[in-house]
Amino acid sequence: MSPQDRPSRTTEAFFGRRRGKPVRPQQAAALESGLDAYRLDLTADAPSDLRTLFETEVSAVRLEIGFGGGEHLLHRAIEAPTTGFIGVEPFVNGMAKMMMAVRARPLANLRVHDDDATRLLDWLPPASLGGIDLLYPDPWPKKKHWKRRFVSPVNLERFARVLKPGAKFRFASDIDTYVNWTLLHCRAHGAFAWQAAEAADWHRPYEGWPGTRYEAKAIREGRRPAYLTFVRK
């Protein structure tokens, strides 16, 4: 996407690098070497065919935004070696965990971005992704902060641009207000069709779902996760 075509970020929340607890020396070493090997270079033009980004032959490319500690992304990348996966995680501690995992088990079908997800979305060519996962994003529970949620009209427009027709946007959350928010925004957008045949569908985990530590905590605390799937028209 050319600079003049990019949506303005003046009214958007910035999803840039964040740090929590100090990373251990071993994690810091894995982070440095891992990012050298797996990080995408957004200063270069994006290839017209994203499959060329990977060190192995892949048939499709998927994106996961905010992969946390990487449990789901790692599981999917191992499960589907002929699919290329791009993972975004601006939280340094989460990226360090992921880089520790791939140091122990290298993955030729993985690339990562450790900064603002919207910059990556604007870098990608149109109709280049076979799917987007947004799993347990920051819910910004206070109503005055809802405008900071990642699901927004401008970001759904980004999703619509980069997803291939028929590709799926999957969203999981245990926060009812965010689930309703996402349903309303996606149904209002026009480019997405909610894929749910019956009421129970949106409480049924995705096929092959490995679960995450965050999800397990939510269930222990009595919150019921929802799993939404939207198809790009």
Swiss-Prot record:
Residues 1-23 are annotated as: Disordered. One of its GO terms (molecular function) is tRNA (guanine(46)-N7)-methyltransferase activity. Pathway: tRNA modification; N(7)-methylguanine-tRNA biosynthesis. Belongs to the class I-like SAM-binding methyltransferase superfamily. TrmB family. HAMAP family: tRNA_methyltr_TrmB. Catalyzes the formation of N(7)-methylguanine at position 46 (m7G46) in tRNA. This is tRNA (guanine-N(7)-)-methyltransferase. It comes from Mesorhizobium japonicum (strain LMG 29417 / CECT 9101 / MAFF 303099) (Mesorhizobium loti (strain MAFF 303099)).
